[in-house]
C-alpha cells in the first residue's frame, strides 16, 4: 500500500511539475518580449499584466519564484541554482565562487513551512 502511494505521489508531482514548467515558459517568453520593447510602448504594460497574472496563478497554488541573493556563496545552493559556464570577472579574490547575477529565476513548490520541491532551478552567473 505504501509503495502504491509513493508511486502515485511521484506520478502526481510529475504532472503538476510539467504543467508548472509550461506556465513558467510562458512567463519567460513574456519577460523576453518585455525586455526587448521600449518601456514607453503601451504593449509593455499589457504584457506585464499578463505576466503578473500568471505569476499570481502559480503563487496562489503554492509555487513561488525565487532569486538567489547576489554576493552569496554558491556552494550549498546547487539544488536551487545552476551556475552557467560564463563567469563574471573580478579582481577581488573573496568574490570568486559567489553569485554575481541571477540569469533566470527559479521556482519551487512549497509543501509546508520548512520544505519545498524544486520546480525549476535558478540560473546564476558566478564571479570567477
What residue spans do the PLM features occupy?
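Extended, amphipathic alpha-helical stalk segments that mediate dimerization
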Residues: 1-13, 18-40, 45-128
Amino acid at each position: 500500500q505504501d509503495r502504491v502511494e509513493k508511486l502515485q505521489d511521484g506520478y502526481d508531482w510529475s504532472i503538476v511539475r510539467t504543467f508548472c514548467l509550461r506556465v513558467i515558459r510562458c512567463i519567460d517568453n513574456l519577460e523576453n518580449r518585455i525586455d526587448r520593447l521600449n518601456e514607453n510602448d503601451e504593449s509593455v504594460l499589457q504584457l506585464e499584466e499578463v505576466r503578473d497574472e500568471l505569476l499570481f496563478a502559480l503563487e496562489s497554488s503554492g509555487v513561488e519564484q525565487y532569486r538567489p541573493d547576489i554576493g552569496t556563496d554558491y556552494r550549498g545552493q546547487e539544488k536551487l541554482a545552476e551556475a552557467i559556464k560564463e563567469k563574471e570577472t573580478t579582481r577581488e579574490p573573496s568574490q570568486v565562487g559567489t553569485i554575481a547575477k541571477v540569469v533566470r529565476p527559479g521556482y519551487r513548490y512549497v509543501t509546508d513551512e520548512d520544505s519545498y520541491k524544486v520546480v525549476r532551478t535558478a540560473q546564476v552567473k558566478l564571479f570567477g
